[in-house]
Amino acid sequence: MPAPTCFSCHKARAALRRPRSGQALCGPCFCAAFEAEVLRTVLAGHLLPQGAVVAVGASGGKDSTVLAHVLRELAPRLGITLHLVAVDEGIGGYRDAALEAVRSQAARWELPLTIVAYEDLFGGWTMDAVARSTAGSGRSRSCCTFCGVLRRRALEEGARLVGATHIVTGHNADDMAETVLMNFLRGDAGRLARGGVLGSTGEGCALPRCRPLQFASQKEVVLYAHFRHLRYFSEECVYAPEAFRGHARDLLKLLEAARPSAVLDLVHSAERLALAPAAKPPPPGTCSRCGALASNKLCQACALLDGLNRGLPRLAIGKGRRVLQVEPPPLGNPSRVTSDPVALPEPCTCKQSKDESNPCGNGGDRAGATCVSKSDLSPVAE
């Protein structure tokens, strides 16, 4: 059976049928429709005003590659200036190859590129060093938690370095739907309530951020890269298999097989939740250490780094953060500074506090909480 004629130009043979509309389109017409939808998303959401200097988070992967290419095509109409900002997390055997892809893209499209590294920004810590530290505490699956927080901070610092007024990232609809599922499965109502907005307005000292590909499915992002002959880095991060996101991704695929519109349904549901009046969070404060936006005394990045520097990476995640809301020690990888652990109160030998009126003060945040184990006080080995 011959392929149908393109629904748009009525001349060329169709190369695909779009899942969301059912329209059969040829390659050029699909790319034009894709770019028009991204333009409509940016204009409808008032995401990038004329004259904006936009820092594009560039990882070398398909999403950031497509985002940079589309915005480069739309830049004259939007009146914006683009600057690629890449983050070197310090992942051996992975990030070096990805950064080469970013450099190649920057040279081909004649876009300025700035690379910022975890090691320079966070006192010598790289993701490989973080992974070794968290593995020693039995929390190897938390690598992506650390990386997500630190990467966000690094991108912010890189954007400020180049004088950007806005930050854009390549999160697509599948990424957003996975995040909605993750927040729901973890019972994180706060993130559910604010996770569907197209972008932040840049409260306080933070730069405005947005996701122009939020309503573009992963399949269509890949198809756009194919028809535009875009080359990108396609290997998965070596720490990704340990992440909880993988389970949400598998669940999303099952849901999509039963209901093709499941991805966009989840994205739009999160958007409606974020627009509800009751969902508006209280205004954020500032971190007592670095001045970044924070809902506690310390921002997430500083709290995570403190846990690593004190040899207590377990306490830097979840409820343990309350223990870390104290004056932090100097930044730096402890394995490079001293082999002795930071002095902390002697942990009690019990597993739980039996006296409801006298909760444990050595690591438990409430009656019945698990105390800090003695193994947590061991120095971090490089």
From Swiss-Prot:
InterPro entries: CTU1-like_ATP-bd (IPR056369), CTU1_C (IPR032442), Ncs6/Tuc1/Ctu1 (IPR000541), Rossmann-like_a/b/a_fold (IPR014729), TilS/TtcA_N (IPR011063), tRNA_thiolation_TtcA_Ctu1 (IPR035107). Transmembrane segments: none annotated. It is found in: Cytoplasm. The modification Phosphoserine is found at S200. GO terms for molecular function: nucleotidyltransferase activity; tRNA binding. Plays a central role in 2-thiolation of mcm(5)S(2)U at tRNA wobble positions of tRNA(Lys), tRNA(Glu) and tRNA(Gln). Directly binds tRNAs and probably acts by catalyzing adenylation of tRNAs, an intermediate required for 2-thiolation. It is unclear whether it acts as a sulfurtransferase that transfers sulfur from thiocarboxylated URM1 onto the uridine of tRNAs at wobble position. This is Cytoplasmic tRNA 2-thiolation protein 1. The lineage of its organism: Eukaryota, Metazoa, Chordata, Craniata, Vertebrata.
